[in-house]
Amino acid sequence: MSFLTVSRLAPKLLNSKNATYFLVAARNASASSTNLKDVLADLIPKEQTRIKNFKQQYGKTNIGQITVDMVYGGMRGMKGLVYETSVLDPEEGIRFRGYSIPECQKLLPKAPGGEEPLPEGLFWLLVTGQVPTEEQVNWVSKEWAKRAALPSHVVTMLDNFPTNLHPMSQFSAAITALNSESSFARAYSEGVHKSKYWEFIYEDSMDLIAKLPCIAAKIYRNLYREGSSIGAIDSNLDWSHNFTNMLGYSEPQFTELMRLYLTIHSDHEGGNVSAHTSHLVGSALSDPYLSFSAAMNGLAGPLHGLANQEVLVWLTALQKELGGEVSDERMRDYIWNTLKSGRVVPGYGHAVLRKTDPRYTCQREFALKHLPNDPMFKLVAQLYKIVPNVLLEQGRAKNPWPNVDAHSGVLLQYYGMTEMNYYTVLFGVSRALGVLAQLVWSRALGFPLERPKSMSSDGLMTLVGAKSG
């Protein structure tokens, strides 16, 4: 049985008497090397063979139907691409290589004295399908610390941006400028064989992930801390701890929150705008810097990465209108008035999920433990009790439950990060873990240029036998 097979089976067996055997087998199988690239080099040929055999046997098999509504409706529900690192189940929520968020919180290594999973461990899981050892996670931390320094032209660029340029515009531009450092772009121009593409994509991805906290912290300091220095990377600290230090936050609980935040926002299967964008642009053999920069331009859109800001704006308006302690009845009336005015309750509902987002749940658990009496958290908790029932009564929502954005902004505000325009940059730093892990596998498996067929409305009408008049 291959390791990836063991990894896929293990989560399903967590409640069985064989669970311990499979998890120990998974841990032992992954313990052979602390070098992530070496582990990948062992896994890739086996996965290439498995996918090749699958395509040969089932390549012509029909996997679904496409309706006119799907074509006009943003391709919702259309099975159209392969994305290995995570799968979103409408009832269960996200699974990272088969593992749920609670399972990741339990199984992934933590920092000394910490309780939240280290994002380095999640990245190892996303890339390999393996639950890493502490030694492997420490290797990733030190590897990213070693690769973190920014080239001088990117520092100069960031220092010369006007202060009215949005943080996400600065973030995307700086990532694009890092393209000057691309190992893949150089190797491709020198005629490297396509079987080696993944190796250079891996190197670029590791470099980029390592540098993102430095870029993000530099933007934060320039915009909100009078251009003060981000300081130096400490190779003895984990990725999140270095990030919070560079941002200027020393509260250990905030570092723990950042570890949780960067873990749970990392990936949400391949159809969302940022993941699909990186997949699409990468299919043109654009290097990881160009692919990820494009993804960040998608994330900056109000329908994708700005939702937690909208939640905070709505909560602040609610507080201003209703005051401090609010009765459930007044809250219920306010929600109904929001809906009757044609607006939505931000932070509730999801394009795919049909239950409470597990990313919301783990943030709620963090808040219950660390800030149970915070007025804004109490307001969020009260909404959780009331909003779903109101939405069910209204009868329009397919999913009346809260999503990840209903909670994240409140936690960041509590620890003093009140600059809402910056929140999407944090989202972007996290999302790199998932989309770049997938980008490595896309090149390893030889995925081709993405080129779907488009149709005009007249063409669709002709296809289905409808009159165009």
Swiss-Prot record:
The pathway this protein participates in, as annotated, is: Carbohydrate metabolism; tricarboxylic acid cycle; isocitrate from oxaloacetate: step 1/2
Listed name of the protein: Citrate synthase, mitochondrial
Keyword Mitochondrion annotated = yes
Q: What does this protein do?
A: Key enzyme of the Krebs tricarboxylic acid cycle which catalyzes the synthesis of citrate from acetyl coenzyme A and oxaloacetate.
Similarity comment text for this entry: Belongs to the citrate synthase family.
Catalytic activity, reaction form: oxaloacetate + acetyl-CoA + H2O = citrate + CoA + H(+)
Q: Which GO terms describe its molecular function?
A: citrate (Si)-synthase activity; identical protein binding
Subcellular locations according to the entry: Mitochondrion matrix
Main localization (coarse)? mitochondrion
Give one Pfam hit by family name.
Citrate_synt
Look up the EC number in the record and give it: 2.3.3.1
Cellular component GO terms, alphabetical: mitochondrial matrix
Q: Which residues belong to the transit peptide?
A: 1-30
Query: What more is known?
Result: Citrate synthase is found in nearly all cells capable of oxidative metabolism.
Gene expressing this chain = cs
Give the record's subunit note.
Homodimer.
Which parts of the sequence bind oxaloacetate? Answer: R359, R431, R451
- Which InterPro entries did the record assign? Citrate_synth-like_lrg_a-sub (IPR016142), Citrate_synth-like_sm_a-sub (IPR016143), Citrate_synthase (IPR002020), Citrate_synthase_AS (IPR019810), Citrate_synthase_euk (IPR010109), Citrate_synthase_sf (IPR036969)
